[in-house]
Amino acid sequence: MSTIELNKRQEHILQIVKENGPITGEHIAEKLNLTRATLRPDLAILTMSGFLEARPRVGYFYTGKTGTQLLADKLKKLQVKDFQSIPVVIHENVSVYDAICTMFLEDVGTLFVVDRDAVLVGVLSRKDLLRASIGQQELTSVPVHIIMTRMPNITVCRREDYVMDIAKHLIEKQIDALPVIKDTDKGFEVIGRVTKTNMTKILVSLSENEIL
C-alpha cells in the first residue's frame, strides 16, 4: 500500500508514464487535454515523492517503486542534523537529588553529564536515578558521577550520521537517547540529542508527507 495518497489526476499521470515513458511533460498534458502549467504541481509532487524520475530533454520515467520502497529510500537519506533536539546537560558534581529534579522539570528521560570543560563524561538514565533512589544513600550528598554510565561506555552520534543507523543503535543498546557530539581538542562537546520520540516524530512526518 502506498504511503503517499495520490489524487485521480496524479494516478492518471503515473499510468500514462508507465505506458509511454520516457515521455515529456508536454505530451502528458496533451493526453490529458490540459496545459503543461496546469500539470506542473502534480509532476513536481510525483518526482519529489520518487514515483517518477525526470531527465532534461528526455522526459519522465516511471521508477516502479512501491510506497514501501519509497518510504525506505527516504528514511535512508535522513540525517541527525535535521531532527536532533536540544540536550539537557548537568555537571558531574551535581547531586543525584538535583539530577532527579532536573529530569522531572525538563521532562526528559536522559541527562548528559559534563565536566568543568563542558566535555561529555557520562550519561544518566531514569534507571540509574531510580536505582540510586531505592538504595540507602543520601541523595542530596551523592554526586551523579558516582552512579552515571561513564565514557567510553557511551554510544554517541554526530550531526552527519544517518537516522536509520541511530534507530538501530537505540534498539540494539536498549537506550532511550543518544548524545549528538562535536569533536574538540579536550573531548566530546554535547550539541544535541536524538531520542525515540524524535524517531516517532519522523515517522509521523513521513506518513503526513511533510518530508519529501
From Swiss-Prot:
Deleted gene: phenotype: Relieves catabolite repression of gapB and pckA transcription. Disruption is epistatic over a yqfL deletion.
UniProt induction comment: Constitutively expressed.
S-S bonds: none
The CBS domain, residue ranges: 83-139, 148-211
Domain of life: Bacteria
Ranges where the HTH deoR-type domain occurs: 6-70
Start-end of DNA-binding region: 23-42
Pfam families: CBS (PF00571), HTH_11 (PF08279)
GO biological process terms on file: carbon catabolite repression of transcription
SUPFAM superfamilies noted in UniProt: CBS-domain pair (SSF54631), Winged helix' DNA-binding domain (SSF46785)
One example GO MF annotation: DNA binding
CDD domains from the UniProt entry: CBS_pair_CcpN
Sorted UniProt keywords: DNA-binding, Repeat, Repressor, Transcription, Transcription regulation
Biological role stated in the UniProt entry: Transcription repressor that binds to the promoter of gapB and pckA genes, preventing their expression. Acts as a regulator for catabolite repression of gluconeogenic genes.
Protein name: Transcriptional repressor CcpN
Organism whose genome encodes this protein: Bacillus subtilis (strain 168)
Gene, per the UniProt record: ccpN
